[in-house]
A protein has these predicted regions:
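Conserved RNA-binding domains used in RNP assembly and mRNA/RNA metabolism
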Residues: 2-97
Length: 97
């Protein structure tokens, strides 16, 4: 497999993932973006584990979908993420649901 084949494979997988996102976004209430991943989830709980210049955040998601083109199954019953970087949690508008 050469570089062009790999680029084409990744582009095709990314397009499939974008289509899957469009198909499933209506099943979820929240969009969650961490420094490493993007998730859709129905329940989100964020806790601050330590304060300071770099606070540690614990994010627990239930009934989630993860944007990851290398996973066979992107539906996950429970996710726990620890982060000390940016975290974005958005409640999806009802019109998008």
């Amino acid at each position: 497999m050469n570089t062009d084949d790999l680029d084409n494979f990744e582009a095709e997988r990314e397009m499939q993932l974008a289509q899957e996102y469009q198909d499933v976004v209506g099943m979820f209430r929240y969009a969650v973006e961490t420094d490493r991943r993007f998730y859709l989830a129905n329940n989100v709980d964020v806790r601050v584990l330590s304060e300071g210049p770099r606070p540690i955040l614990e994010v627990e998601l239930n009934d989630a979908w993860v944007w990851d083109m290398y996973r066979k199954s992107r539906f996950v019953p429970k996710v726990k993420v620890l982060s000390f970087k940016d975290l974005n949690v958005e409640e999806l508008p009802k019109a998008d649901i």
